[in-house]
Regions:
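Short glycine/acidic-enriched loop and turn motifs that connect beta-strands
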Residues: 130-134, 177-179, 225, 268-271, ...
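Residue position within the beta-strands of beta-propeller blades
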Residues: 125-127, 172-173, 219-221, 263-265, ...
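Blade-level signature of beta-propeller repeat domains, shared across WD40, Kelch, NHL, RCC1
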Residues: 369-400
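Short coil/turn segments that connect the beta-strands within blades of beta-propeller domains
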Residues: 121-123, 167-169, 215-216, 258-260, ...
Length: 400
C-alpha cells in the first residue's frame, strides 16, 4: 500500500513538473515610435540663416515641431528662417502608430544661431577735404562721445567716395581731383594707391566718385559709366558703358545683393541728373526720378526706402535743397532734413540704432561742417560730430 501511494505521488510530481516548465509563446511585440531628427543651416549658422530639418523618426504617423522662436510646424521636413541670434530649443513631438509604454515621442536639440558681428567692431568711416588736402577717418560707434581717428596721410585732395570690404578688412577711397583710388587697412594704416590716372593702363580711373565692393571686385562711377577692377587694382575695365546716354556720370552708387541691382544718382552739374537702377549685367536700366540733382545716396533695402541729398534744379520735381526720402522705386518723395550751403557727398545708416547720418558742409574745405544724426524718418536731428568737413561715409561692422 505504501508503495502504491509513493508511486502516485511521484507520478503527480512528474506531471506537475512537466506542465510548469512548458515554454509560453510570447510572439513579436508591436513596433514602437521613436522621435528623431537632424538639421543643417545655411550661412554657417550665422543669423540670418535658414535651417532645414530632416525628420528621421521611426514609425510615426504625425509630427509637431516647436522651434523655440515662436514658430511651429506640422510639416515632415520643415525649413525655418532664424533671423535672431541665440540658443533655441527645437522640440519634435511625434504621433505614435500604437500607444505603447516604450514609445519615445519627443526629441529636443539646442540650435545656436550665431551673431554675425561677433568679434567685429562697428565703425563709421568718413572722408574729409581740408586746405592742405583730403583724408580718411574713423569713429568707433560705442555710444560714447565720438572720437575721430585719422587715417595715415596720402596725397588725396577731394575724396568723394568710400567703400568698405568687410571680408578682407580693407577701405577704398576714390579721389575725384587726383584721379585715383586708394586702399587702406581697416584701421586706416598701410595706404596704397591701387589705381592712378597717370599710370599707363590705368587711365580709365579718371574722375572717380561713387564706389562699392562686390565679391573680388571694386566698382566705381565716373564719366562714361561704371568701371571695375580687381581688389588690388589690377585689370581695370569699363563695366557698363553709358557714354553720352544717361546716366552719364554715376556719382554715388549702392548695390543690392538680393535684387542684383545697382542704385545710383547721376551728376547734373554737367549731365542730365536723375535717380536710376540698373541690373548688374547692364540690362534693365530704369530712371525712377528724372532730372534731379542728387549728390549722395543711401538705400535701406530692408525697408525699401531710398535717402538722397538733392539740390533744387530746373526741370526736376525738387524745388528745395535738402535730404529726401522716397520709396525705392522713387515714389513718395519727401524732404526730411536740411544740408548746408555746400554739397553733401555722404550718407549712411546705423542699423543697430536705426539712425541716418549725413554731412552738413558750410564751406568746401574748412572744418566748419558737421555730421548730423537723425532717426530714419529725419526726426530728432542732432549735431553728432562738429568741426569737420565731411564728404563720403559708411557704417560697417568690421574686424580691426
Amino acid at each position: 500500500m505504501k508503495k502504491i501511494i509513493f508511486y502516485l505521488i511521484l507520478a503527480l510530481f512528474t506531471l506537475t513538473l512537466g506542465t510548469g516548465c512548458k515554454k509560453k509563446e510570447l510572439g513579436t511585440p508591436p513596433a514602437s515610435t521613436i522621435a528623431n531628427f537632424t538639421y543643417t543651416a545655411t550661412n554657417n549658422g550665422v543669423a540670418p540663416c535658414e535651417v532645414t530639418f530632416t525628420n528621421t523618426s521611426i514609425n510615426a504617423k504625425g509630427s509637431f515641431w516647436d522651434f523655440g522662436n515662436g514658430q511651429t510646424s506640422t510639416e515632415v521636413d520643415p525649413v525655418i528662417l532664424f533671423d535672431s541670434i541665440g540658443f533655441f530649443t527645437v522640440k519634435l513631438t511625434c504621433t505614435p502608430v500604437n500607444n505603447l509604454y516604450y514609445n519615445q515621442l519627443e526629441k529636443s536639440m539646442i540650435i545656436n544661431v550665431k551673431d554675425p558681428n561677433a568679434g567685429l567692431t562697428q565703425v563709421l568711416y568718413f572722408t574729409s577735404r581740408g586746405p592742405s588736402g583730403g583724408n580718411g577717418h574713423m569713429v568707433i560707434l560705442d555710444d560714447g562721445v565720438p572720437k575721430v581717428q585719422d587715417f595715415e596721410a596720402t596725397d588725396m585732395e577731394r575724396p568723394y567716395g568710400i567703400a568698405v570690404d568687410t571680408a578682407h578688412s580693407k577701405v577704398y577711397i576714390t579721389d575725384y581731383s587726383v584721379g585715383a583710388i586708394y586702399r587702406f587697412n581697416s584701421d586706416g594704416k598701410n595706404p596704397l594707391k591701387i589705381l592712378d590716372v597717370n599710370v599707363a593702363g590705368q587711365e580709365i580711373v579718371g574722375d572717380p566718385e561713387g564706389i562699392f565692393v562686390l565679391g573680388d571686385k571694386i566698382y566705381w562711377g565716373r564719366t562714361g559709366g561704371i568701371y571695375r577692377a580687381n581688389l588690388d587694382g589690377t585689370n581695370p575695365e569699363i563695366f557698363i558703358n553709358t557714354g553720352s546716354t544717361p546716366p552719364e556720370y554715376p556719382i554715388d552708387m549702392q548695390y543690392d545683393t538680393t535684387s542684383g541691382k545697382i542704385y545710383l544718382v547721376n551728376d547734373k552739374t554737367d549731365y542730365s541728373g536723375g535717380y536710376f537702377s540698373v541690373n548688374l549685367d547692364g540690362t534693365g536700366l530704369t530712371e525712377y526720378i528724372p532730372a534731379i540733382d542728387g549728390t549722395a545716396l543711401e538705400v535701406d533695402f530692408a525697408t525699401g526706402k531710398t535717402y538722397m541729398a538733392i539740390y533744387a534744379s530746373t526741370g526736376s520735381s525738387v524745388t528745395e535743397n535738402g535730404i529726401y526720402m522716397c520709396n525705392i522705386d522713387g515714389t513718395g518723395l519727401s524732404k526730411i532734413g536740411d544740408f548746408g550751403s555746400k554739397a553733401t557727398w555722404g550718407m549712411t545708416i546705423d542699423y543697430k540704432r536705426n539712425k541716418l547720418f549725413w554731412g552738413y558742409k558750410v564751406s568746401n574745405s574748412d572744418p566748419d561742417g558737421k555730421i548730423i544724426r537723425a532717426n530714419l524718418d529725419g526726426s530728432s536731428p542732432e549735431d553728432w560730430l562738429t568741426g569737420v568737413s565731411p564728404h563720403a561715409m559708411q557704417v560697417v561692422w568690421i574686424k580691426l
